[in-house]
Amino acid sequence: MEKIRLKLKAYDHRVLDRSVAAIVDAVKRTGAEIRGPIPMPTKMKRYTVLKSPHVNKDAREQFEIRIHGRMIDIVSATSDTIDSLMKLDLAPEIEVEIRSMDK
């Protein structure tokens, strides 16, 4: 038995929550113990650009992008659990980081 930590990131929290629900369902079907999903702090990146290409430094526009994250710990992963995770079809905008931690 080994512990697996999944970290998921996405710009849209609705797509992220659907993917997390699919992962949790797949893991629970195999009988593995799961902890989470744990919501991670939302990271915000702000960009300020000039509206005018030449003058008017006071005229600026601000853009913001939010990165949402979730973390799932699979405590007692089996080979069936790993197979079911590999067969999942997640949305393309989800970034998944997988770490294996031996007990």
From Swiss-Prot:
Region forming the signal peptide = none
**Key words, A-Z:** Ribonucleoprotein, Ribosomal protein
InterPro entries associated with the record: Ribosomal_uS10, Ribosomal_uS10_CS, Ribosomal_uS10_dom, Ribosomal_uS10_dom_sf
Give the superkingdom in one word.
Bacteria
Spell out the Pfam families in the cross-references.
Ribosomal_S10
State the Gene3D superfamilies in the record.
Ribosomal protein S10 domain (3.30.70.600)
Quaternary context: Part of the 30S ribosomal subunit.
Record function comment: Involved in the binding of tRNA to the ribosomes.
What protein family is recorded? Belongs to the universal ribosomal protein uS10 family.
Question: What name does the UniProt record give this protein?
Answer: Small ribosomal subunit protein uS10
* This protein's encoding gene: rpsJ
